Structure formats: structure tokens, C-alpha cells
Amino acid sequence: MRQRKATAVRGRVVAAIVAAVALLAGSLVWTPSASAATALVYATFKGDAAADEELWIYQSTNGGTSYSVLADTNFRGPTGVLRDPSIVKYNGRYYAAYTVQSWTTNSTYFSIATSTNLYNWTNIATVPSGIANTRFTWAPEFYIEGGVVRIIASVAATNCSNCFRPYVYTARNTALTSWSGPEQMWGLGFNHIDTFVWKAGSTWHAFTKNETTKYIEHWTTTASLTSGWVNRGTLFSSGYEGPSLVRLDNGQWRIYVDKYVNGGVWTATSSDLWNWSSLSLVGCSGCRHGTATVK
């Protein structure tokens, strides 16, 4: 009897010790947050002066709340002007699509460059807008779905005012040197620029600037990338443009917007693409409209 009782007591003591050790071990386990684990690069230009219209690459090791300069590439493309770069990593290489003229100069195409190291860039494609009487071709943004690489560019014609529309261009090869298009994103209304798309589940989400009201708008569709778009409302206050998104390690999305009136890139986060935190200023000296990608 005493032997069974002593055995039971020892069992309870051992169990208590094991539980205590497990609790202590659990308290010491470090689970990295997205902000600590997500290393990002941000491609941007610095302003309207001729010296600022070139490709700059910044790097973040805290999930994109602050950046430091990785490379002033001095890359300006064939026209000597590079603005609004969109960066993506694809098949082991980096690609940047960009606007080729200032916002006051006519542009009928966008260009694409590539790099293996983020420092040295080579232009590989010039993609015509394909729209009659093109006046401006702005802010080409990469969109990849199912291994297919697409670019969404904002195009306006000379024969109308306030008529920017988003058009989709599709890569014909894995080198991204040949492209088809344009295809219009039907339903997404007149005079929208800087359209950035992300698909979550069966829903495509577009974040775009209404160039008339100066608000960032959220649009969705469940039909296709090029049809059925419905306006779901505005984000933030007016005075921001160039929305772009990146997915963090914890599953959240981070949006960047360019506060073009007073300067600076601002950011917010969301777990569902519908509800967003308040904007906060990104530590990224000199940064303007650009995009981020996981390094």
C-alpha cells in the first residue's frame, strides 16, 4: 500500500516538474514576427528633377516600416528618364517596369529592365501602349497569376481629357521580352491611374488613384482581371497616389502610397484587403512612388 502511494506521489512530482519545464521552455521560444522576418527591397525614383529620375533600390530588414539605400543604380533607361518603377522577382532575376518620361512629356510606351544583383540593370523590352492617339503611358505595375506575368499600365489619349484607363499587357515568353495587349479592365471607370492588383482567393482587388477626386479607391471583381470591376470605396484621405502592395510573412498585406503633395511614402497593413490600419510614415529618405518585393 505504502509502495503504491509513494509511486503515485513520485509520479505527481515528476509530472509537475515536466509541466513547469514545458511552461518555461514555451516562454523562451521566440516566434519571429513578420516585421522581423520579412526582408524587402523597394524600387523607387526621387522626384521631378532630371537628376532624380533614375532607379534607386532600398532595403528593409524590419518588414518594410523603414528602409536604407542599397543601390543608387544610375539606371535611367534609353530615354534618360525613369519614374514609377515596379519591381518583381521572377525565375531568379529581378525585373523593373517603369515610366519613360516625366509627367508633363508625352509617352507612348513603357519599358522593362532586368538585373541579377539589384545593382546593374539592362533594358530588355519597350512595350507600346497599343492605344490610338496615346498621350501618356504611366506607372506600369507587375501582376503575376498562375505563372503568367502581366503588367497593368495607365494610358491616356490625346483626343480626350481626364481619360486615363488601366490596360493589361501579357508576357509572351519567360524572358519578358515579348508582350501582347492591351486588354482594358472593363468596369474600372474613367481617369484612374496607378492601378495595382492582388488576387486573394477568388477575388481580384485593385487599388487605384482616381485622378479626378485624388483619392485611392478599392475595386473588386470575381469575374476576371479584365471585367466586372465594382468600386468598393476610398482609402485614407485625398492627396496620395501610387498604391502598391506586398505580402508579409504573417499573411498580412502592406500597402505603400506616395504623399505627392508634401512628400514621403506612407504605409498601412491589412489582414483581409478590406480593413486597413491608419497610415504611418515610412522611414525611407527621398523615396517616392515605387513598389516593394520580398528580397
Language-model segment annotations:
Residues M1-A36:
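Secretory targeting and sorting signals
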Residues A37-K295:
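Carbohydrate-active catalytic/glycan-binding domains of CAZyme proteins
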